[in-house]
Amino acid sequence: MKLKKFLVLLLIPFLYACSSDRSGNYDDAFAKDTNGLDLLTGQFSQNIDQIWGVNELLVASRKDYVKYTDSYYTRSHISFEEGQITIETLADANRLHSAIVHTLLMGSDAKGIDLFASGDVPISSRPFLVGQVVDNFGRQINNIDVANSFASYLLQNRLQSRRLSNGRTVQFVSIQMIANHVNVRARKYLSLVRQASRRYGIDESLILGIMQTESSFNPYAISYANAMGLMQVVPHTAGRDIFKLKGRSGQPSKSYLFDPANNIDAGVSYLWILKNEYLAGITNPTSMRYAMISAYNSGAGAVLRVFDSDQEYAINIINRMQPEQVYRILTTVHPSSQARNYLLKVDKAQRSYRRAR
């Protein structure tokens, strides 16, 4: 029951983001739509409970693509972190075959796919998963013929089943992505990363490290905090700062942030804001980088409060420390365990992209 309640709470911002492209005041819109949103959330959860059973609710997240089809009787799940694709159905094998094909050939335009609706995902002439998955012959799956052939192979040779708590039987197939699937996705966005790096003076490896940590280069990424896209920009907080920097009012919409070019530009411009406004005064470049990474996750105020409640004095303390000391404090003393781990993960990822140059 606790798990179910947590997932329903997680669904609230997800459903709001997927059911609205409004770019007005988030807080007002959210408050006004509370009753309708509660109804929508409850209906979705109830549908999944009735069809799949208790504790089978699965929704999209930062590093997981989840799409229901066939009136929620079929679903596709891509774990971009683990490199695993699972497609399962409570319907017949024909529906599973169709879901396999549509998943393998889906495009990269997150704006064009409603993750909350239960319709089929459009087949794209430029599938997003090309280069990340191969068929049983080792071929790239880039057209309908190869996808159909591979789907037939999977159903004939790798079909599995499991029993749900409600007594229903699920048929499913699992597909392992290639070993370097993360790097394949990263390369898709290199040109956009380089443009943003030059525009804002932020190191490419830092941008890539943050993208990997935030979304594992999942263009459909959305979180319980309503963060969206590759760099997980929250519209009503960082989004407002970003628009203010650009001389625009309001906040970015869902469709704006699900555009990879806009999302990367937004995320990198926020790094610029952290560096040149909120954390301005930190003199050591390495200490600044550590502070920026931690602040991207937890906010600049939270980072500075680790050192002192007075922001100016906190910056002076940081400047008297060696970068290694700043790193150690942010990864051990920061009150948020998520923020502590975040700096560790981004720093490790950034180092790997530096070596890859």
Curated annotation (Swiss-Prot):
CDD domains: LT_MltC_MltE. Coiled coil: none annotated. It catalyses: Exolytic cleavage of the (1->4)-beta-glycosidic linkage between N-acetylmuramic acid (MurNAc) and N-acetylglucosamine (GlcNAc) residues in peptidoglycan, from either the reducing or the non-reducing ends of the peptidoglycan chains, with concomitant formation of a 1,6-anhydrobond in the MurNAc residue. Residues 1-17 form the signal peptide. InterPro entries: Lysozyme-like_dom_sf (IPR023346), Murein_transglycosylaseC (IPR023664), Murein_transglycosylaseC_N (IPR024570), Transglyc_AS (IPR000189), Transglycosylase_SLT_dom_1 (IPR008258). Keywords: Cell outer membrane, Cell wall biogenesis/degradation, Lipoprotein, Lyase, Membrane, Palmitate, Signal. It is an enzyme of class 4 (lyase). PROSITE patterns: PROKAR_LIPOPROTEIN (PS51257), TRANSGLYCOSYLASE (PS00922). One of its GO terms (biological process) is cell wall macromolecule catabolic process. GO terms for cellular component: cell outer membrane. Murein-degrading enzyme. May play a role in recycling of muropeptides during cell elongation and/or cell division. Belongs to the transglycosylase Slt family. HAMAP family: MltC. This is Membrane-bound lytic murein transglycosylase C. It comes from Mannheimia succiniciproducens (strain KCTC 0769BP / MBEL55E).
